């Protein structure tokens, strides 16, 4: 069986509020070498780590990230009360700069930075790239930008040394006739083709969301070894002895 490479999906999101510094640190402490985060822009153009299209699930607030200034967002708590009750009541939204500072201290970590479609649709590709790309100057070996928006990735690919990764929910959304090729392709496990077509592509294939050991073993048996998971600690522990996945 192949040795798996696990990517911490929004940090250790199974046990901590996703995309927060405590979730990212918990993933690193668990042994993660690869982490993935989501980026959106505040009303006053400050990049923050946040996944959802609205603030309700994670912060119990109305509206979307770009409805608020960064100072306003910092007054909200990222609690995910449905999952964690009030355990993390004082947990704050992290800025992208805080995450970059964290990566510079933990230079062994590799990060996938997802540029969210909502942000790109609202502010435009040009503005997003003008703000975000310079923040990662000198970190080209540590960072890969990913997105469902292939146009913005093509611009990154053509203007910088950063790796890129296309994200799709269905295999049919992956278009190979674009005149360029990303280094990575992220595909949902439900969207994988039934045949071995997924193994024939040039980009490295990463699959999400791999939430249990049985699924991880199934994908490994098919030759897919880059697995994105909310349960980074459990997965790393399960495959820590020769990649056998013997723990539950």
Identify the function of each model-found stretch.
Residues 1-248:
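Phosphate-group recognition and catalysis centered on beta-loop-alpha active-site segments
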């Amino acid at each position: 069986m192949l040795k798996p490479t696990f990517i911490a999906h929004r940090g250790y999101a199974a046990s901590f509020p996703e995309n927060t510094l405590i979730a990212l640190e918990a993933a690193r402490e668990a042994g993660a070498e690869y982490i993935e985060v989501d980026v959106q822009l505040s009303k006053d153009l400050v990049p923050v780590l946040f996944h959802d299209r609205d603030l309700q699930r994670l912060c119990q607030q109305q509206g979307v990230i770009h409805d608020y200034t960064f100072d306003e967002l910092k007054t909200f708590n990222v609690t995910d009360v449905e999952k964690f009750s009030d355990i993390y009541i004082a947990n704050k939204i992290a800025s992208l700069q805080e995450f970059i500072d964290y990566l510079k201290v933990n230079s062994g970590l590799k990060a996938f930075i997802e540029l969210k479609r909502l942000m790109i649709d609202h502010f435009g590709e040009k503005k997003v790239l003008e703000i975000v790309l310079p923040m990662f100057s000198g970190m080209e070996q540590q960072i890969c930008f990913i997105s469902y928006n292939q146009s913005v990735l093509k611009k990154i690919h053509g203007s910088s040394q950063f790796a890129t990764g296309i994200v799709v929910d269905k295999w049919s959304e992956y278009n190979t006739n674009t005149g360029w090729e990303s280094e990575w392709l992220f595909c949902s496990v439900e969207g994988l083709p039934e045949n071995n077509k997924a193994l024939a592509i040039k980009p490295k294939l990463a699959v999400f969301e791999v939430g249990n050991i049985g699924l991880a073993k199934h994908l490994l048996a098919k030759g897919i070894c880059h697995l994105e998971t909310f349960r980074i600690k459990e997965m790393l522990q399960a495959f820590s002895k020769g990649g056998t996945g013997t723990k539950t």
